[in-house]
Structures are given as structure tokens and as C-alpha cells.
Amino acid sequence: MENNFCKRVSLLTLGLLLTYISVFAQIHLQIFVKDSKQQAVERAEVSVQYGDSIVDFGITAKGVFTATVPSAGIYSIQASCVGYTPVSISKEVTQESKVVLVMTEQSILLDEVSVTAKKIPQTTATGTVYTLSQNAKECGNPFKALSEIPLLRVDISNQTVEMADGESPLILVDGKLFNSGIAPIDPSRIESVELSEVVSARYLQMGVTKILNIRLRKDTPWYSFSELRTRHDFPSRYGLGAGRFEVGKKKFAISGYVGLTYLRHDKTSYEVNESNGSAIKNRNGEVKKRTDNQDGYLLLKWMPNSNDYFSAIFKGLNNDIRNKAHFDGRYITENTNNPFHNNQSETSSDGGMLGSFYYEHSFKDNSILASYAKYNYGFAKSCQVNVEENADNTVPTMVDFDSRRDQYEVSIDYDSGEKKYGNITSGASMEYTMDKDYNYVATPTEELHTKRLNSFAYASYANGIGKLYYMASAGVQLLSISTDADKTTHWRPKVSASLTWQLPHQQVLRASYYLTNRLPETSQLTAYNTSTNPWYRIEGNPYLVPVMIQNIDLKYDKSIGDFMIRVYSSHNRYNKMIESYVRTEDNIQIESYRNNGTYIGTNVGSYISYRAKSFKASFSVEYNWDKYNGQSAKGYVDLNGHVRWDFGKFFLYSTFDWKNKSYTAISHTEYHNPTNAHVQLAWQITKQLYASIAMPYYWGTRSQTNITEMTGYSMKNKIRFKSESLRPWLLVSWTLYKNPKLRIDNKNPDM
């Protein structure tokens, strides 16, 4: 069945592709729109007119629009874009040819001072296209340049990019999957940055809901990039050392990365009050964590000609964990009150290797056909020992398991590019995962097998009418789960749609909807115990089925000078929700998972951002409701903000996040102070040398209390993160670019 399904999808995609290509048998005219510096003008409106009739109209993508004219003749070609002076020429067209239109930026004269017009962000069906300022392009740091975008929260020192709500977007370069390549980009090469807050069914399949697409200028001979970074806590706790490089010519490039991180002397204290029936265990203690992590990759890129691109990536990851804990307390029953001691130890490791191949072909009409294949091998093993001593009674418990994963993925996608009729994309993908789990505590050793299939085919269409933009994407998803106890197959729809209205005076109103499906994780399906608590077991459920997720978003944006204000609301609905529940067997609490009806989550909030040349700040407030099946709605507040002040070669940066509570189906967490309170001072010593010192948590000692309450059992666990609080770190990085304008863009997905 799976082979026939893939064949049908491949034939359908190929048929659509041949149909699109055959339509354009008339004369094609490639229109390049550039500014005075010969950089492409993104999203310029282009029209081709014959006499009094407009024969073609469209918007540039990467500075190019391909027009179709019915026959030879003299045509009037016009281009306009916000912030530029419109341009118009006449051209005699007799065969397929190229036209270059050069637009000049508008200037406003005020008392003999010339002020270049600020480029207004361009609204699309799914998001917004930003053009970076000249200051951002000349800053030399791509993360600092991206921080100019109002809806992004960028940590320049740690090289991370988040949305204002804390979600990490998928990073694309020139529309291609790309996750590890922001650092090598010279910001002077950035033509535009598109932030998509609604994605097509293709990206929903990957679990992505936000995209940051960085479009670059095209050039290329020899170039190189290298970077060394190191960061360490004081006193010693967490540290890292990393190096990356890229070197290449016009048609070939190689890049690589090696990173080492460590964690030492990390102490977290616990105050635990646990009751099971009439028995009570109260204890205080401390967990000491030790980890070592190694990861790296090697990436090869080859462009034999301007229309074909090949890349291959090889990655490796290993993570080792060594934890120890000791608790002292009292064990209380109706007749006894004895001292209680608890010792715990954990030795774990996980990691894997990945190899992937990517190919892309560009057609003459700027449409693209891309294919991708991946193999991933993963492993995880853990041995945990818990010993409880109560008077003369000693109770040891152990968890000892080993997991192996083989995962295969293939995909093919077609993108028509921007055309007069809009943009059409279609494609198909298949991911097959095989997991083996060994439970060494069981006698004989228990071996469990889990297989998951996730196949998908889709088509998307996007266009606009005046200031109204729309996108619709639909597909069908085949989900299969096979365990030792059960096997199920599910056909599910997958849908994404958006409607965006660009109102006068820099106002935008956007409504969006998506429906997607999610397979249960293997850890939720494997039916053996993974807890060392003798009163409380945790095990999976092999009979789970996929969750169906629906989301409705409504956003209103208003820009006023350097300010941007947003008011928003979001509603989520999870059908066949996989949630935790607890049952009692032989006076033991067993936490497992089940598909339990419907979960509903709703939030409303507002966000304000200010972006000036040397000062940037944002603040948001949000109220959330969570409603689990059979329970009443529970609400909580979420606040976050950030500020950055640049002065000379220095900048001061701070972030702040606070919430009062959070909920699951069986427990809730109370937060006693902010979840994040970070401040740092950075210094760009030279163009190559950068240093920063930070206090990752300055609000005292971060703490929270986790509470679980049910009939016959309760646990209250107060946690204090002692080592990660009030502990500064120092980061130093050295970066060297040579001919950075000539870098080949990475288009291989980073998994």
C-alpha cells in the first residue's frame, strides 16, 4: 500500500509539473528590477502594457518577474515600489529576452537636508517582507542586523533568533531549508527578510508554524569564513567551545562545524512532600548534574551551472549525562515516624548520526523543483538507580533501557514562483521511523518494536486582489503506527489558509486557520516503566492514535513611526488529545497516556515594539486559558519583554519573562519569580573580535513548585535552581570573512 501511494503521488506531481511548463509556449520576458546600487528590488509591482491593454502584471521575487506576452510587438514596461520613484520604458519584443529596470530611492528635501525615504514593510498573504536599513547592512553581524525586525527577539551573543512570543522560527535562505547558516552571512548581502506567520501544509508536516526567510544577493569566486567561540560561567558550571568554517569557489564549497559543551557542579535543590494513602514521605535534598556534549557537521555544496544545485550533509551528535542526588527526611505512617534517606544516580547517553542529500533545479520561468533524502540513526540508553532507606528497610528500584532508531525520509516539491495568476506549490513526502527498545530490568530482557509512517501529499495556492492577499493549502496525510500490541492506519486531511487585508495608514489585519495531525512519540507508546519512584510508575500506551490539531489566529498590526503595535487572539483545539492520566494498581500510582477527548487552549494579548537606530525595546502581555477534557478552564498570565541599547562599540541587552502558573491534565506549576531574567553587556572590540559578559539570571534564585493532587495520592515538589542563578558568564568570539559577498548559499535542510 505504501509503495503504491508513493508512486501515485510522484506521478501526480510530475503531471502537474509538465502541465505548468507546457502552458508557457508564448514569448517570455524576464524583467529584472534593481536599485541604484544594482541590488534587486523585492516585491516591486511590474506591469506590461500593449496599447491601452495590460497584458501581464505581477510582483518581483528576488528582484525578477517573468512576463508572458502573446506576440511580437512594442510594449510599455512599468515598475513601482514603495520608497522608489516609478520607472517606465518601451521595448520592442521579438523573442525571449531580458529587461533591466533601475529604480532610484525617493528623497525628501527639508531645509537643504536630504532624507532617504524609509522602506515600508511589504504585506504578503502569509506575513511581511522587510528591507533592512543601511545601518543594519553595514553592522557586520547578521544577528544584530536581524534584530531590526519588530517581531523578532534576537540574542546576538548566543546567536539565537526567536519570535516575540518565544517560538523559534524555521530559518530559510532564499526559500530553502536552512538552520545553521545565519552566522556566516554578511548582512550587506541581505536583500530582504520575509517573516511568515502562516505556513503552507508542507511546513505544517514538518511541525513548523513560523518561517524566517532571508534572501541574499547573488555573486561568487573564492571566499572563506571562519569563527571561533568560547563561553564559560564563573564560578565554573557551564561552558562551550566551538569552531566553524566555510571555504569555496564559484561552483563548489565545503563547510564544517565542531562544538563541545560541558556542565559541572550544577546543583538543584528539592523539597518534596509525597503522600500515598496514609503513608507520607517528606524529604529535602540536592541533585548534582554533569553533562558532556559533542556535535559537528560537514557540508558539501556544488553548483555545476546556474540552474542546478547539489548538497550533502553529514552530522554527528553525542551527549553524556552523569547525575547524582541525595535526600534526607521522614517516613510517616499511622504507627511510625522514622528517618528517611534516599540516594539516586543516573548514567545516560544519547546521540546519533545523520546523512542527507538535496537537489534543486531552476527552470527558465523561475519555477523550482527540489528533492530531498535523509537517513538518521539514533540511540539512547539510561541506567537509573534509586535506593530508599527507612529504619531497617531498604528499597532499591532501577530503570535500565536501551533504544535504537532508524529513520528514512524522502520528499519532492515544486514551486511555480510568482506568476500573474499567483503562486502554486505542490509536493509529497514520506518519513518512516523504526525504533527498538530494550528493557533490561525485565527478566528475560524485554524487546519492544515501534514503527511509524508519516506520508503526505499537498498543493498550495497564493495570490492577491488589490490590498487583499490570500493563501490556501490542502493535503492528505497517511499516518500508521505499529507496536507489538497493535497496528493502526489513519487517513487525515491537512489544511492551512490565511486572509490578509492591508488597510490604510500602515495597518494590517490577518486571519488564519490550520488543521494538522501529530503522531504519538515512541516514548508514549513503549509500555515499560521509566520511573525509579517505588510509589509512582511512568509507562507508555501502545494503543495511542494520532492527535488532530486545529488553530485559528486573528492579528491586527499598526505601525506608527518607529513603533509597532499588535493585538491578537489564538484558539487551539486538540481532538483525540494525548494527555497524561494516573491509575492505581496494588497501591502504586501508574502514570500513562491516553487519547482523552478534546483539549481547548485560548489566548488573547497585545505586543508593542520600538525600533530606533540605537535603542530597541518590546513588551507583551498575554492571558491564557487551558481546558482539558472533563475539567474546568484554568487561566494564567504571561509577560515578557526585552531591551537593547547601543552606544558606540558597546550594547546593553536584557530580557524578562514571567508567568504565574502553567497546567497539565494531572498537575500544575506555580512560579515564584520570573522564568527568565537576563542581562548582558557586549563589546565589538574590532571587526573580528567580540566579547560579552552576562548575568543569565539576576532575579535572586529561580524557583517553582510542581503540584500533583488526585484521590489517594499527592506530591508537592518545590525546586530551587541554585547553580544557574546569579552566576555570570563571559563569551569571546573571533570571526574572519574573506570575500564574504561570494559565499554560496546553503540549501540543505538541517535536521
Question: Where are each of the predicted segments found?
Answer:
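Short, acidic, small-residue-rich periplasmic hinge/interaction motif at the N-terminus
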Residues: 47, 80-84, 98-135, 197
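N-terminal periplasmic "start-of-domain" segments of outer-membrane beta-barrel proteins
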Residues: 51, 61-62, 114-137, 160-171
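N-terminal periplasmic accessory domains that precede
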Residues: 98-102, 112, 116, 142-145, ...
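Extracytoplasmic beta-strand/coil segments of soluble accessory domains associated
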Residues: 143-177
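Short acidic/polar hinge/loop motifs at secondary-structure boundaries
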Residues: 148, 176-202, 243-245
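Transmembrane beta-barrel wall of Gram-negative outer-membrane proteins
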Residues: 236-264, 279-324, 351-364, 641
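Face-selective signature of the C-terminal outer-membrane beta-barrel domain
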Residues: 293-320, 344-486, 490-496, 502, ...
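Outer-membrane beta-barrel signature, preferentially recognizing the C-terminal barrel domain
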Residues: 507, 517-566, 573, 591-602, ...
